[in-house]
Amino acid sequence: MTSEPTTGRIRPATPDDVPEILAMIRDLAEYERSLHEVEITDRQLTALLFGGTPEAPGVAATTPNGAPAAYAHVVEHPDAERGTRLGAFALWFLNTSTWTGTHGVYLEDLYVRPELRGSGYGKRLLQALARLCQERGYRRLEWWVLDWNEPALGFYRTLGALPMDEWTVHRVTGDDLAALAAGAEG
């Protein structure tokens, strides 16, 4: 872990970044004790971020207006031993507030390689997303964080992020999702 500022360049991801982003997604899932849940392939991630036709069902490569379903920003980190490589990434998509009538950004994943934590990359990625929100008139930037992830919780507090304790996340998957769908009028 480093505490000295780094000079990595933040930029939108490109298709060439997909293998490194996927490796970091797996690293993040392992840290979150959920590696066994990662099913996404290079092809699916490419489709999500850049469009195209994925092999698996359930992947909307683009939104109805043709925009990618999700976006990613990466940090190019100068590495003396390996050359430039990705040091961090943020994967996000648009959400909507019916109360404000505007979009917002939902941050699905923020990951900084362990040896680069404290480098400022996480903060710089969040600043880039906040700037994007401001430039486009989006009114919120939000994400989930595991309640046991104290380093992340502390980091987010330093940025002014507030936990929304009055909300509880709900999810329906697998057989329960199929059962719910079976009861829907068609």
What label would you give each PLM region?
Residues 85-87, 96-107, 117, 164-165:
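A conserved beta-turn-beta hairpin within the catalytic core of GNAT-like acetyltransferases
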Residues 72-74, 84-93, 106, 111:
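Conserved beta-strand in the GNAT
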Residues 43-74, 106:
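A short helix-loop-beta-strand connector motif used in the catalytic cores of GNAT acetyltransferases and
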Residues 113-115, 119, 147-148:
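Active-site acidic-Proline motif in GNAT/NAT acetyltransferases
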Residues 123, 127, 135, 147-166, ...:
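Conserved active-site alpha-helix within GNAT-family acetyltransferase domains
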Residues 134-144:
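Conserved GNAT acetyl-CoA-binding A-motif
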Residues 22-58:
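Conserved GNAT-fold acetyl-CoA-binding loop/helix
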